[in-house]
Amino acid sequence: MAIVKCKPTSPGRRHLVKVVNNDLHKGKPFAALLESKSKSGGRNNGGRITVRHIGGGHKQHYRIVDFKRNKDGIPAKVERLEYDPNRSANIALVLYSDGERRYILAPKGLVAGDQIISGEDASIKVGNCLPMRNIPVGTTVHAVEMKPAKGAQIARSAGAYSQIVARDGAYVTLRLRSGEMRKIPTECRATIGEVGNAEHMLRQLGKAGATRWRGVRPTVRGVVMNPVDHPHGGGEGKSSGGRHPVSPWGMPTKGYKTRKNKGTDQYIVRRRNKK
């Protein structure tokens, strides 16, 4: 995997920084694990925009990724690594010894030809998945479940990982990348290692069009809108809005806490680090 800067033959190429991985499969994905994916354009079933800045973008197929890793005791061989347009991480196509194929998140260090397995007795090896009660304290994990058998929800993006820092009764304490410490039931599963493609954060798209290819539309400032469209709108000439920064719906937008308390807050041992 390499970070590539292009010759400045145009402004878009001048600022482009891309991640090149020659280990990725260059052909088509495995058809049996694809689903159609329709674009919403940010509209709901009434045709109204409910999420701004969404629209257009390249057509995509959804890759069905196995986040449960519940095929226990059956070894699998990694056939190839693939690009997935739906996530920042790469995915791996694995072939189980009984003939079934599945996609999994590709951990750092996993290559074609490797053997992986999931289940109670799986060894502590990159790509193996097992309950956290069987994983030693201090181990780096990813694709962590929050409820047993629900499927992985934590540490799924490129370069993500968590660390098991303690085990107490029916819970393990997990340290997340954000600095948050959280209790997770020991029956929940996690995969050993960290998610690959960590260089994803170093890329630069180079031009506005590359963002449009990804289905993201422009963000317009409130101060250049009309009063009917935004609380900062209107005024004569280039006025600055005349009030503290707010969202289009009037909510303070600079540091105002909007998170509602949840029942699962009791499992948070320490809040995330302040930015």
UniProtKB/Swiss-Prot annotation:
Coiled coil: none
Gene Ontology MF annotations: rRNA binding; structural constituent of ribosome; transferase activity
One Pfam family this sequence matches: Ribosomal_L2
Record region (Disordered): 223-275
Keyword Ribonucleoprotein: yes
Keywords: Ribonucleoprotein, Ribosomal protein, RNA-binding, rRNA-binding
GO biological process annotation, one example: cytoplasmic translation
Domain of life: Bacteria
Record-level GO cellular component terms: large ribosomal subunit
Keyword Cytoplasm among record annotations: no
Oligomer and partners: Part of the 50S ribosomal subunit. Forms a bridge to the 30S subunit in the 70S ribosome.
Entry's family note: Belongs to the universal ribosomal protein uL2 family.
Record's function text: One of the primary rRNA binding proteins. Required for association of the 30S and 50S subunits to form the 70S ribosome, for tRNA binding and peptide bond formation. It has been suggested to have peptidyltransferase activity; this is somewhat controversial. Makes several contacts with the 16S rRNA in the 70S ribosome.
HAMAP family assigned: Ribosomal_uL2_B
Name by which UniProt lists this protein: Large ribosomal subunit protein uL2
Native source species: Psychromonas ingrahamii (strain DSM 17664 / CCUG 51855 / 37)
Lineage, top ranks: Bacteria, Pseudomonadati, Pseudomonadota, Gammaproteobacteria, Alteromonadales
